[in-house]
A protein has these predicted regions:
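N-terminal leader/targeting and accessory segments in enzymes
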Residues: 1-64, 68
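Phosphate-binding loop of NTP-binding sites
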Residues: 61-189
Length: 189
């Protein structure tokens, strides 16, 4: 397995230490090792027992590793980004695809919804109420959708989610850009 949460680490897992606004994952490397981590990855620390990234982002590496670990994904995945309209567009896509006879899903603010021509099933909501799920939740969810024979998925791709590499490792077949306004410009300096 792969995780950025030391509490979720099991035997022979890869632990990726991510530095966030409030926590530094490198402070949890020892706990991850005690829990069975085979390998720990971190940015900018000097420790001969840790694989240190000299360049690049631990967030990016984490998402790419998850994409390899959860390799099964639906055939058609589109990302929808923009200041406004992401939720509406992913919902419209899911509904249109279902009417065309494809088993479809949407992921984002409203949770994960699977739709067939006969019913809608909402079965997951992001633990953190994020528009774009954290990479571990996103990749597990895509793997789960594949196992439920979903062929088409529309994902809300927030600007924060894109910037934080949450969608890396997802094999997107298309993208939609809705619009751009001044929201979030404080984040994207």
């Amino acid at each position: 397995g792969v995780s950025s949460n030391s509490k979720d680490i099991g035997k022979d897992y890869i632990f990726v230490a991510i530095k966030g606004e409030n926590f530094d994952g490198s402070n949890y490397i020892e706990e991850a090792k005690k829990n069975g981590a085979l390998l720990a990855l971190a940015e900018g620390i000097e420790d001969k027992n840790v694989f240190t990234l000299k360049e690049g982002s631990s967030r990016l590496i984490y998402s790419l590793l998850l994409g390899c670990f959860y390799e099964k994904q639906p055939k058609q995945i589109i990302g929808v980004t923009g200041t406004n309209g992401k939720t509406s567009v992913v919902e419209f896509c899911r509904q249109i695809w279902a009417q065309a006879g494809w088993r479809s899903a949407s992921m984002g603010t409203l949770g994960t919804k699977i739709e067939t021509t006969t019913k809608i099933d909402t079965y997951h909501k992001s633990k953190n109420n994020l528009t774009t799920y954290e990479p571990s939740d996103l990749h597990k969810e895509l793997d789960n959708l594949f196992s439920h024979h979903v062929s088409h998925v529309a994902i809300e791709a927030s600007s924060h989610g894109i910037d934080q590499y949450r969608l890396d490792g997802v094999r997107l077949s298309g993208a939609v850009f809705t619009n751009l306004s001044h929201d979030h410009l404080d984040y994207h300096k």
